[in-house]
Amino acid sequence: MNSLYYRDDTIELHVGDALHVMESLPSASVDCVVTSPPHWGLRDYGTAVWIGGNPECRHSLGTTPHQRRTTKKRTSSRLRSSVNKSCRKCGASAHDRQYGLEPTIEDYVDRLREVSAEIWRLLTPRGTYWLNLRDGFSYHNSGTGSTRKITTEEVPSVVRHKSLMGIPWRVALTLQQNGWIVRNAMVWHKPNGIPDPASDRFSSRYEMLFLLVKQPDYYFDAARALEPLSQNRPEHRKNHRGGNKPHTVRSPWHPRGAGKNVGDVWSISTRPLRDAHCSPFPIDLPQRCIAVGCTKNGRVLDPFSGAGTTGLAARQLGRSFQGIDLRPDYHDIFIRRLLGELPSGAGEAA
């Protein structure tokens, strides 16, 4: 089945499961991958296809506290995941290929391993793969809402209640075992992170961004990974080591090079996009990744493109872009942003 949804001179958008769509793309056709897969256990993006049951039914999964309690008593943890994929009113089954709703962490990690294996095939030998992942905590089964709780029945027995699960590093180490070089592990610090209601731990204010490559010799434009040096005026250097007399630093200091390496802690505020119900992803993040890790006139791929922020960054930097998503309405948002009907640089979403 043809997955192509939109195409212009530099943009190509596909609708479908990331793994299946990538299998149809030619090998060594992508120079850079920048992506943020749906985080495990965070939310349901509503991509299920209902089969059977009553077509007039307003389908609902069995996710009330009572249903969870009774299901827990009657079935094993593996079977519970399939029970919760049936409509509690008419019995229709929900078939869903979205990522992030896997029954266990191991299943989530394994699916990202499969996706990354296909990315390996698509990447050129010197290509770069930038993978943004968020961690989560293990909780008891309680409450309802659009944000799905990660329960103790869904995590390995060694992860205790309230424990941080280490999902980003579970994925990174799995990919390392599969041949990827984990070249960097950036901390994306979010100064304006959403308030955390927890009262017995510190608030979470960061996500991980991994730089993965196929070989030691890969494309990396170090000049695009620099930030300005501090002021070189004499008054800013009076208290240098060895003396504090102003006359000892009268002449300006001329730095070597254009700046210093930005390091592996990136402080970038989130900028939610009003029209897209997906995780905030500021355009500054893919811009830096693409500027540093994609050849000039190269091609960028985002297999979980959402509202297309990576695509906007690619276009602004003169690269072509391929995006994949299960939801065509997210592609529609991206197209509107390309056409200038929505802001392209203020409010961004992955």
Model region roles, listed by residue range:
Residues 1-217, 224, 231-350:
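S-adenosyl-L-methionine-dependent nucleic acid methyltransferase catalytic domains
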